[in-house]
Amino acid sequence: MVSSNQDLLISPSIPYGEIAVPPSKSHSLRAILFASLSKGTSIIENCLFSPDSQAMLTACEKMGAHVRRIGDSLHIQGNPDPHHCHPRYFHMGNSGIALRFLTALSTLSPTPTLITGSHTLKRRPIAPLLSSLKQLGAHIRQKTSSSIPFTIHGPLSPGHVTISGQDSQYASALAITAALAPYPLSFSIENLKERPWFDLTLDWLHSLNISFLRDQDSLTFPGGQSLESFSYSVPGDYSSAAFLASFGLLSSSSKPTILRNLSSQDSQGDKLLFSLLKQLGAHILIGKHHIEMHPSSFSGGEIDMDPFIDALPILAVLCCFAKNPSRLYNALGAKDKESNRIEAIAHELQKMGGSVHPTRDGLYIEPSRLHGAVVDSHNDHRIAMALAVAGVHASSGQTLLCNTQCINKSFPYFVIAAQTLHANVRHYQADFPLRSSFCR
């Protein structure tokens, strides 16, 4: 894991090698939640253990689930009727998924639930989801209309509502709630963004035998359904794979970088990033359970970020090495992640000599020779890992990457993985002068 020693020192290097990709965060969190709401005992193999996973597990235990960890697996005895518990308190840590999903599920209970989280979670929008839940009859008390903390309870009333699609997690949260409601619920999604991630939630519901009708972006759930226990092995995380792949793609090595533990049948949105890179000319071989990256040049261009918006930071780094300028667009949602990713990655890459400029809904990037610099993660795991890739492929100089404990959110063993691929990434030691003057 990224240790309490929170900074990384990165030197230009020539990555290559073979490695297993860590488990998917999105699948792990959904598996934990669905297992906790199922009848019987579910077994989840190869689960990602991270602060977000712990936040979800803690909340699910408060809803009556019993959890045992055995190695890299979880045995979860679910509580299919968790909605008549004593008043509850959910601390969501820094998990946007836990915040949105459990907020909506709390409306199935007449028992008030206090929902809060870390100070950084307060910047994650929740108002559009709360507005739709209120229209269905939810009772909500909050100090401010736009963030945690707040108290929420149901019951909801049968009916139809429109939900904002600006963040796909709003629609996913409502779909999960409607799936388990004792009465019919339907909703329409307005201007759905990040569509692959919503489809991933529906794939889960379908695999668990939940019935619903879908007419484009309108869904109807009949009510009165329940979940049965299941066994599931979490596949690799395409979002994390993007960083490892970038180590290899930009390398000057003659050897490939091979990423294992990936499923070509998976519906994760960031899987589409690899198809995009192939279209731009990158030498990538996509197998059933692995991806092979060969160092190669590739073109930039006009890139619609909506299908893989979480990849904006690493794609910004890659586009610095493209043969021609790039415009990343349709990425407004990137402003409301763990950081304003548009501003954050542009600011930090500019320190490294990158010609990276924010636009209204994305970035304009010109090919640039990057150099080492002192940069900061903005407490965002994807910004941190993207900057690590940039530092490894800088043309000169070391990079001090400050405040990297956030990487634990999705890739606790990122430093070990980078080193396995022969990237010179290590925890900060005292040989870098004047650290306290730069890393706050």
Swiss-Prot record:
<dbReference type="GO" id="GO:0009423">
    <property type="term" value="P:chorismate biosynthetic process"/>
</dbReference>
<dbReference type="GO" id="GO:0009073">
    <property type="term" value="P:aromatic amino acid family biosynthetic process"/>
</dbReference>
<feature type="binding site">
    <location>
        <position position="341"/>
    </location>
    <ligand>
        <name>phosphoenolpyruvate</name>
    </ligand>
</feature>
<feature type="binding site">
    <location>
        <position position="382"/>
    </location>
    <ligand>
        <name>phosphoenolpyruvate</name>
    </ligand>
</feature>
<feature type="binding site">
    <location>
        <position position="169"/>
    </location>
    <ligand>
        <name>3-phosphoshikimate</name>
    </ligand>
</feature>
<feature type="binding site">
    <location>
        <position position="168"/>
    </location>
    <ligand>
        <name>3-phosphoshikimate</name>
    </ligand>
</feature>
<dbReference type="InterPro" id="IPR006264">
    <property type="entry name" value="EPSP_synthase"/>
</dbReference>
<comment type="pathway">
    <text>Metabolic intermediate biosynthesis; chorismate biosynthesis; chorismate from D-erythrose 4-phosphate and phosphoenolpyruvate: step 6/7.</text>
</comment>
<dbReference type="InterPro" id="IPR023193">
    <property type="entry name" value="EPSP_synthase_CS"/>
</dbReference>
<feature type="binding site">
    <location>
        <position position="26"/>
    </location>
    <ligand>
        <name>3-phosphoshikimate</name>
    </ligand>
</feature>
<dbReference type="InterPro" id="IPR001986">
    <property type="entry name" value="Enolpyruvate_Tfrase_dom"/>
</dbReference>
<feature type="binding site">
    <location>
        <position position="25"/>
    </location>
    <ligand>
        <name>phosphoenolpyruvate</name>
    </ligand>
</feature>
<dbReference type="GO" id="GO:0005737">
    <property type="term" value="C:cytoplasm"/>
</dbReference>
<keyword id="KW-0963">Cytoplasm</keyword>
<feature type="binding site">
    <location>
        <position position="310"/>
    </location>
    <ligand>
        <name>3-phosphoshikimate</name>
    </ligand>
</feature>
<feature type="binding site">
    <location>
        <position position="96"/>
    </location>
    <ligand>
        <name>phosphoenolpyruvate</name>
    </ligand>
</feature>
<feature type="binding site">
    <location>
        <position position="409"/>
    </location>
    <ligand>
        <name>phosphoenolpyruvate</name>
    </ligand>
</feature>
<feature type="binding site">
    <location>
        <position position="337"/>
    </location>
    <ligand>
        <name>3-phosphoshikimate</name>
    </ligand>
</feature>
<feature type="binding site">
    <location>
        <position position="30"/>
    </location>
    <ligand>
        <name>3-phosphoshikimate</name>
    </ligand>
</feature>
<feature type="active site" description="Proton acceptor">
    <location>
        <position position="310"/>
    </location>
</feature>
<feature type="binding site">
    <location>
        <position position="124"/>
    </location>
    <ligand>
        <name>phosphoenolpyruvate</name>
    </ligand>
</feature>
<dbReference type="InterPro" id="IPR036968">
    <property type="entry name" value="Enolpyruvate_Tfrase_sf"/>
</dbReference>
<feature type="binding site">
    <location>
        <position position="25"/>
    </location>
    <ligand>
        <name>3-phosphoshikimate</name>
    </ligand>
</feature>
<dbReference type="InterPro" id="IPR013792">
    <property type="entry name" value="RNA3'P_cycl/enolpyr_Trfase_a/b"/>
</dbReference>
<keyword id="KW-0028">Amino-acid biosynthesis</keyword>
<keyword id="KW-0057">Aromatic amino acid biosynthesis</keyword>
<comment type="similarity">
    <text>Belongs to the EPSP synthase family.</text>
</comment>
<feature type="binding site">
    <location>
        <position position="169"/>
    </location>
    <ligand>
        <name>phosphoenolpyruvate</name>
    </ligand>
</feature>
<keyword id="KW-0808">Transferase</keyword>
<dbReference type="GO" id="GO:0008652">
    <property type="term" value="P:amino acid biosynthetic process"/>
</dbReference>
<comment type="function">
    <text>Catalyzes the transfer of the enolpyruvyl moiety of phosphoenolpyruvate (PEP) to the 5-hydroxyl of shikimate-3-phosphate (S3P) to produce enolpyruvyl shikimate-3-phosphate and inorganic phosphate.</text>
</comment>
<protein>
    <recommendedName>
        <fullName>3-phosphoshikimate 1-carboxyvinyltransferase</fullName>
        <ecNumber>2.5.1.19</ecNumber>
    </recommendedName>
</protein>
<dbReference type="GO" id="GO:0003866">
    <property type="term" value="F:3-phosphoshikimate 1-carboxyvinyltransferase activity"/>
</dbReference>
<comment type="subunit">
    <text>Monomer.</text>
</comment>
<dbReference type="Pfam" id="PF00275">
    <property type="entry name" value="EPSP_synthase"/>
</dbReference>
